[in-house]
Amino acid sequence: MLFSSCPLPLYASEASIVFPDTLSTPFKRYSLKPFMRPARKTVGIALSGGGANGIAQIGVLKALDEERIPVDYIAGTSMGAIIGGLYSCGYSPADLEIIAETLPWQSVLSIREENPRARIFLEQQRIRDRSTIAIRFDKLKLMIPKSLSSAQALTGTLDLLVLNGIYHSWQDFNSLPVQFRAVSTDLISGKRITLTSGSLSEAMRASSTIPVLFEPIERDGYRLVDGGLVANLPVDELDVVNASYKIAVDTHGSMYSKSGDLDLPWKAADQAISILTGLQYPAQLEKADLVITPDLQSHNATDFSDVKALIEAGYKKGRVLAGTIRRSIETRPVRETDIGSYNKSYLFDGGESANREHTGIVSGIVRNGTALNRTLTELLETDLFTSVYAVIDKPKKNIVFHLTPLPRIARITITGGPQGVLSIEEGETCFRPVIGQLYTNTTATRSLEDLVRLYRKKGYSLVEPQKVILSGDNLQVTMSSGMVNGIEIVQNRNSIGLTPILREIKIDTTTAIRSGKAEESAENLYETGVFSRVSLSAEKTPFIDDGSGRTLTFSLVEKPSSVLRLGLRYDETSNAQFLLDLRNENIGGTTSSFGGWIKAGKNNSVANLEFAMPRIGSTHFTLFSRLFFDQREFDTRDLRFSADFNGYDSDDIASYGIQRYGITGAFGTRIRKNGRLAIDFTLQNAQSYHATDSGPATLRTAELNLLSVGASLTIDSRNSAQIPTSGSYTHLSYTVTPELLDNDASFWQLSGIHEENIPLGSHTTLQLSGAAGISGSYMPLSEQFFLGGPGNAYSRRFIGLKQNDLIGNNMATAGLQLSYSPPFEIIFPASFLLQYNAGNVWEKRSDMSLSRLIHGIGTGIVWNTPAGPAKLTVSKGFAFLREEGDRESSSLRFSDTLWYFSLGHDF
């Protein structure tokens, strides 16, 4: 109970002081001054799980908020824990509604484990692009995944929402404005574990972790998963906190009724949990004083397509029952004093002249008052006063009501916080409802919260009111610094050194923490590829209230470093091929990788031993080296065109082989994560040969020992190497090979490739690409440019021609591709392609001419299968050629129609 600090006047011994019945639960929101609150029953809400159906709980909270029905306690499970946790840390129902409508639920709850391709190191992109299956080992022990996903997207989303909350806990959820409890299940013992302290976002995440789909949260020796397994509607948790009035919000919805509906693993998991929760409900519902069940009309728990309708369903049911709740939480005094016949008056602390606006409100309540406690309660319910009491003289039938109004505010001064962030006008806007006018305690609290929201919108997650002082009519608000006193790293294995971790953290502890930098730091750590989950928290340290008593904690769950990757591929040129890649991706705790990979097929074989340092220490320098062996055989033909649309299929085919082995190394600097500028060298034996029993040899072959040096720039921001829908790819390279070893002639090569992917809506992408390269007058066959076919590691894409149809010292090509990915599946997710390209190769730079261009057009379909992309394309090459002796006109000529098919990633 809060009392006025003003000295009480002296009264005759017959007079007595009567205080109103007030709420004993502490007020934990921001306020200008401590104030009395009228007595009522404490209100607790139990929020159930239910997946997407749980979104309806926001509508219930919205209805209660509009009816000014307070909530003192929340106990939540699964989605109820997420909504309840966010509500407890200061998000209003309006805030939650915006979050629910704008959050990309499908990606947040996705079981896809991979990082966005555009945000990982180039070496990691190449490794990931060519493999189909990845298997991890821990000290030669096969690590069988215990879940389909670590749920990093959900973890990161909840972390940032809690970090940007209006209030932060003191490592105890009872310190939040609404005391909070999250229910989870220990997967080992099956025990019910109620989380009441620690990281709020981790508690929400633990309570909503669907077994098998998401990785359990390890905490205090428990492996925590969805609380719906043991208590999907935790009404009994409200008994633990002694809530006087218990409301149950049941949004578990209905189960799937058809076997065909259970077509995905998460739907089966949801059905299993629904079966378990159905057994718990009768006992929990009996404990509730009121049950709110939104009309969800058999809505499925995995359907987030119509969030607005779900919120509206909860809102409608909440509005219907709000009146019942309001009446039920009222309290009546045990004994009441009749003051109807008393002489009644009132006194304001500060005098009546300074509180004239209050007079019109108070006079009516006092004049019409017939019961003492009821009148005191009505005065408090105006929310205009910090304290109210009465002095009653029963013998004289005289009563005086003493009221301490909220002080009048004429000016607002905001100090502290990060410098230059808020203008005077922005700060005053937050307090406009209280400056120079009558206001309530609730309005004052909302103004302070609006000030905090303004800082949150500007990206300052930890700035909050540190001191609020009323000096005369001047309100002085001192904001905290928004800084942390340190960064703590918590690892589950401690297998990674601090340098690779700290270099990815972009937090400056000498300045206010920015939410964008915190998010970037967490993403950077996850994108190194050595962590399965990265979470952050910034709970306050108890007993330190100067704004700096926080530690920013990064909790890291490390992956086993040994990885075996496998790949399979089939195409019409090389037939079946097999990939095996084995490497350690965290040598000595540095995140450097060492390993090798081999590829075996009918016409090619590759073996590589690689060492890569994505970053050297805390710098952006990078190092890469590789021992390699690469051997392939290929066919070439005499490319001809015919006036007949069916074209001309040449039988004049020659077979060649190229074999290279040696060592290459590169040193350079990172350009973000997906780019690199480097100098490199290659020492190799390069042998080209004409295969026996094939057509006549038209290409010059040789065996040479070569030492080449060069420089390259590579930037790859594509979201996919196969069918990208965004991003670009750029590669520029210059190489010179001097007359060394047994190389009789020096040569050089300059080339560039660029690809730009432009989204044309949510399902269509236009890809523009171009490549050009020039060389010295002499180039060994192994170093020349190869064009033709659908594109692979050896021959650049040129639709309408066979692989390796064009081989030369100089080349130029340009193309466009239009892809459409329908919203429905054709057995698997699919994309339709329409492609065009033009270009050619030339032996001499002086021969390069637009009049010699060859064109190709094609269309195809790509399926995204579990074994990798399956591509089927039909194409046609054509050219505008002049008849012999005709220099003025040209005619359209065609090559043969070609079909391309491949299954699996290109490696």
Question: Which stretches of residues belong to each language-model region?
Answer:
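Acidic/histidine-enriched alpha-helical segments
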Residues: 256, 326-341, 396, 439-446, ...
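Outer-membrane beta-barrel transmembrane domain signature
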Residues: 821, 838-857, 867, 879-883
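C-terminal outer-membrane beta-barrel translocator/porin domains of Gram-negative envelope proteins
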Residues: 699, 706-830, 834-838, 842-844, ...
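Gram-negative/organellar outer-membrane beta-barrel architecture
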Residues: 410-429, 437, 441-454, 464, ...
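Flexible glycine-/small-residue-rich
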Residues: 184-187, 196, 294, 350, ...
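Buried hydrophobic packing residues in well-ordered domains
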Residues: 50, 80, 96, 190, ...
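C-terminal segment of classical bacterial N-terminal signal peptides
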Residues: 2-9
